[in-house]
Amino acid sequence: MIVVAGEALIDLVPSSQSPSGDGPLPALLPRRGGGPYNTALALGRLGSPAAFCSRVSTDTFGEELLRGLRADGVDTSLVQRGTEPTTLAVADISPDGSAGYGFYADGTADRLFTLPAELPAAARAVSFGTCSMVLEPGASAYEALLRRSAQQGIFTALDPNIRAGLIGDPDAYRARFRAWLPHVTLLKLSEEDADWLAGAEGVAAAVKDWLAAGPAAVVLTRGGDGLSVLTPGGAEIAVPGAQVEVADTIGAGDTVNAALLHRLDAHGALSPDTLAALSPYAWRDILGFAARAAAVTCSRPGAQPPYATELVGPE
């Protein structure tokens, strides 16, 4: 089982990219979202045994979030519940399909997550990231779960998925990020997030430092230009992006997270040792699968990751 730990929220996505003339503003369409939520959903759709570990509101949005997971086979028994409202993220879609977000997260249910007693014995990997690693007091509980999972020998994956507007002290966050790395097996991040985290050091030097701190691999995504993996031994393997007409990029990175974990599992590589021993051929297969999965998500509005049947066929 792959456990995904983090927030579930509602994305409010404009029905069109810009208002016309003096007419009304575009309607905002509610869609299920949150980086970890999207990752869990994508794992379920790909056919991986997956569970979601979070705190979700008992309001109507919360019920819909859980219904969506269950419909795609995701175990929700690790979800804590609360009467506080669901976090809202208002999306701003650029002409190229990229998305920015404004968050309404004060006093919401997901940020009151507490450390669970234990994960199921079947848990072989735990994935973390996004707002849940920033917003207290829940962030400290997720961090504790990351550390405990690593100490228990469980494969851990981290996608920082930076939301700069939620980070009050960037330098403090960067220091906290570096403190997580000894407990991370696989670090995946976008090129933009890597640049933000690296600061003046530069991405190339920073990635070397991050690898030296603990991860067995770092995967960098470059949007339509594809993605690459870097390893502590200095290897770099890259694959191109899959060409598609982009509706928007919401959930694309989350789909990559799920596709990486799903395909790593297929290669028997959900452990630090087996991850470090993967061949270039295996990595090209894993990265190529992730690129194709993300392209499907980008081809339709909102975070709608692909089902396994949509990825069958010529590569």
Question: Which residue ranges define each predicted feature?
Answer:
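Conserved phosphate-binding/catalytic region of the ribokinase-like
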Residues: 3, 201-315
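Glycine-rich phosphate/adenosyl-contacting loop at the front of the ribokinase-like
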Residues: 1-75
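Conserved beta-alpha-beta core of the PfkB/ribokinase-like small-molecule kinase fold
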Residues: 131-208, 225-226
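Conserved N-terminal subdomain of the carbohydrate kinase-like
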Residues: 49-130, 154, 315
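Short beta-strand scaffold segments in enzyme catalytic cores
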Residues: 41, 88-92, 226-230
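Short, conserved phosphate/pyrophosphate- and ester-handling motifs at nucleotide-, phospho-/glycolipid
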Residues: 43, 190, 253
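Structural motif
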Residues: 1-3, 124-125, 186
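Active-site metal-binding loops of divalent metal-dependent hydrolases
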Residues: 8, 35, 131, 160, ...
